[in-house]
Every structure is written in C-alpha cells, then in structure tokens.
C-alpha cells in the first residue's frame, strides 16, 4: 500500500512538472518576455536567486540581463526596472496600467488584504483613502500647523542630550532619543498626543509591537512560501505570529488612541473647522459612511510604519554620514552659523534658505535611500514595457537605489558628496523631477509623506549640527555604516554610538 502511494505521488509530481513545462513553453510562444535567468518548473528562478531580493543583488542581475529583466519566482512574475526611461514608463507614462499593488501573504495580514491606502490595488478604494488621508496629513497647511511642534521636539532632543553626561564622553545611541522624537512628531499630528520620555510604558509597548511588525514584514525569510504555494504550509507558524502581532497592534491603536479621541470629541462641540488633529478628520469620514472602523485602524497602521520608521532611518543615515565626514559636518555648521547667526536655532522656514543643508538631505536620500525598490507596483492586465510583454499581475520593482547610484548617471556615486546637488545636479529635486532620483517615487502612487519628511529631516539634522560636534566613540575613526536591506527598506545594520560634544555660542 505504501509502495502504491509512493508511485502515485511520484507520478503526480512527474505530471505536474510536465504540465509546468508545457505551460511555460506555451507562455513563451505567446509572450515576448523580458530577458532573465532560465527558470525551472515549479520553482522558477527561486533556486538560483534565493529569497534575498535586496537592491544590491537586483543591481548585479541588472548588470547581467539589462535595464529590464524577468525573474520567475515560483508562480509569480517579478519584473525589475533599472533605467530612468523605463521607470518613467512605469511610474508616469503608464502610471494607471502599473498603478496597482501586489499581494503578499504577510502584507495581506497586516493590511487586512488591502484595506489600507499604501498596499491596496489601484481603484476607487485607493482614491477614496488617498483623499481622506491627504487633508489631515499631507498639505502645506499641516506643515504650518505642526512645524512648531517639530521644532519643540528637536529642541527637547538637544536639551536631553546635553543633560546626559555620557553623550559628550563615551557617547550614546542617539537613535533611541530620535525615535521618541519621531513618534511624538507623528502622534501630535494623528492624535494631538505625545510621550514624555523613553520610559513611557505605552510608548515602549507601541515601539515593541511596531518593531516586531517591521521585522516580520521586512524579512526575506517568508519569500519561499509566498512565491511557491506548495511550500506555504511551512509558513504556518510565521503567519500565525504575524496575525497575533497584527491583532495586538490594532487593538492597541483602538483602545489607547482612536477610542480615547472619540471620547474627547464627544465632550466637545467640534465643527469641521474646529478639528484639531488627523484622526478627527478620519473619524468624520467614518461617520459619513465613506470608510469603516477597520479602514480607520489601517490608516493608523500605515502612518506608524510609513511615516515614522522611514524618516527615522533617513535621520540615522544622515547623522552617520556627517560623523564619518567631519569636513562636510563643519561646512554645514558654517552655513548654519553664517546664514542664521550663532545661537539662532533653525526653524522650518529657515530650511528653504540653506542650500548646503538641503544638499546634505538630498545626498543622504540618494546614497542611503530608505525605500530602495520603492513599494512594488503591479499591472492588473497584460501590458507592454520596453518592447516586452508583461503578463497580468506581474510584480514590478523599480530599483530606485540603482537609478541614483549608477555611475552611468552620476559622478562617483559611491561617495557621500552633497556638493553634487549644488553643481552638476543643482536642478535635481526629491519630488521626482528627474527620473535618476526618486527617493519618494513619483506619480499616482508616490509617497505623499515627502511634504513632512523633508522639513523634519532638515530641522533635526540642522539642530544637531548647530548644537553639537558629532563624533565617533573613543578609539574609532568612523562608525559602521553597513546596510540591512529588507523587502521595502534600507536601514543601518547597527545603531551606532555617537559622541555629541556641546558647542558654546
């Protein structure tokens, strides 16, 4: 009986392989597909390239196969684009055709199968969510309303670092205090709330759950089960943990923030003109029946990840580069002292008249792009790109990091050199006016958080350089800037200890 079962299993596997080969050949005849490594049945290219599809590995494949190539990852088609012209096609010219988002077994859990804004398919739900989120989060009015809070939070960082005797001697992990700052920046906007210190129990609970969510979602470890359905049973434990983390996070958002704001609103007479923070606008949309309670919580979910973490990564990278390039730090400090005057602390309006500071921010976002592959795109229907056929529901990755670090487009791209944005790249902006440089993407699915991230980066880096000489810890000439890439992320591998010596004015 066992022998018969084994024979049936082997026969079934053989037939499955034959069918896969036949389908592959039929598809090959029907489509003119982009080049790429030769796939094998069932597994595609997974056995060749593995799970770790980070920006540098995909860059190596682009050097071999060209500006557009195809990877067959199990049942999924993965198309990688690595040139400015093709990126323009995906993000702008054919922005509608390639405007959807791919499904992913882990992100399906964390977004309720696309009930959020960032990872939903292109269509009416996305347009509605984008509209509802834009007014309370992503307008110049919001910047002007909350920039005083950002300046206060940066000033509090400076004060706390000065109070810490370790900061000026052996150094501190500055990121920890900056993380509190970023949570306060965004929670002021969302809920008109802030956390008093790094020891706040609610802050620590929130930070831990968000960190676990980020670790689970950004890992490449689950790719095999996402790409190859027959291997998905091996992911059951992983997906169970994801579900548990998701439920705990959403319950935390609901109990401590959304419901608390509802109670406060019920005690006040709030008109549309009197809404004070983002969640009031969002709850108003819920009352009108435009969205449901789950949508409200997934909006909060998006902001916790997309706004807080990515900006924090960029701040951390900027500090690391300034520590490792003291001549650039000195030049930036000279600009701040000269144009603002010694002792005048930088404010949001000042950021527009400080060209070298802006160049430092741009260069940080170029060399250390927080989302190096942007958020993946997808075409719902068969499409054409670069003279090739792109089958429906292909995952499209734009290697924005390589666009910004390709020596064919940039002079000595491996160097951290802010001057490039004052010289040969003086007209290049972070808003996507040049398809060699897309730190926030461009087009319909671009990151609307650019309007918040740029001033927060400028204020934070400016205040730190104004008030401190930032140095590596004793015994080190530089700090470690090794990278840790993820599904949609690029952050520093080790949170470095930084010496912050106060300046006297």
Curated annotation (Swiss-Prot):
Molecular-function annotations in GO: heme binding; iron ion binding; trans-cinnamate 4-monooxygenase activity
Membrane topology: Single-pass membrane protein
Subcellular location, record wording: Membrane
Bilayer-crossing regions: 3-23
UniProt cross-references to InterPro entries, sorted A to Z: Cyt_P450 (IPR001128), Cyt_P450_CS (IPR017972), Cyt_P450_E_grp-I (IPR002401), Cyt_P450_sf (IPR036396)
Main location: membrane
The UniProt record lists the keyword Cell cycle: no
Entry keyword set: Heme, Iron, Membrane, Metal-binding, Monooxygenase, Oxidoreductase, Transmembrane, Transmembrane helix
Domain of life: Eukaryota
Catalytic activity as recorded in UniProt: (E)-cinnamate + reduced [NADPH--hemoprotein reductase] + O2 = (E)-4-coumarate + oxidized [NADPH--hemoprotein reductase] + H2O + H(+)
Binding site for heme: 447
Family indicated by similarity: Belongs to the cytochrome P450 family.
Protein name: Trans-cinnamate 4-monooxygenase
Biological source species: Populus kitakamiensis
